[in-house]
Amino acid sequence: MIKSIDLPNIKNITVSGRIGSGATTVAMGLSKTLEWPLLEGGALFEKIHQELNISEVNVNGRPDKFDLEFEENIKKILREQSRQIIQSHLAGFDAQNIPGIFKILVVCEDSDGNDKPEIRIDRLVNRRKISIEEAKVEVLVRENENIEKWQRLYANGDKNWFYWDKNYYDLVINTYSHNQEETLKIALEAIGYK
């Protein structure tokens, strides 16, 4: 039986990031290295969309109750389980005020802190083998619809609220200036993995 790695003072790890930022890649690397199970939010939402027979891009076709239940389930897992890697857009936001959670935000920004959507689109094209136009819809349209919905559901309609606010996180990694191996190394060093 494989024994997972114990990290003092860290019960669970969340990994959040915008579409195509590299959050899933970081989460998968952490899961493999630490031998902790990975809960991937995107895969769960994809399943919900399939069950509802709606496009993943059709954020508003997904009833609010699915978002609310999903985020409550994430919070429950973070409170009640241990040695989990939770990767979802709102996982770090959900983890606020829950002790023992190490929250990672993965961004793709230039040196001035500006998001690089063209890089995220390119990554999506390569990872999912979809067209540039499909990737643009994912990154530009679906992301904006998610934000509008989540601002309404979780921030009382505050248009200045974004889950990628760096103040919510213990570690911010910029994949614009680091490759996959460097990014994983930064995360592992930050959590105290030797």
Language-model features, listed with the residues they occupy:
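Short, amphipathic alpha-helical "lid/cap" segments that border enzyme active or binding sites
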Residues: 67-71, 180-188
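ATP-dependent small-molecule kinase phosphotransfer cores
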Residues: 39-99, 114-118, 122, 130, ...
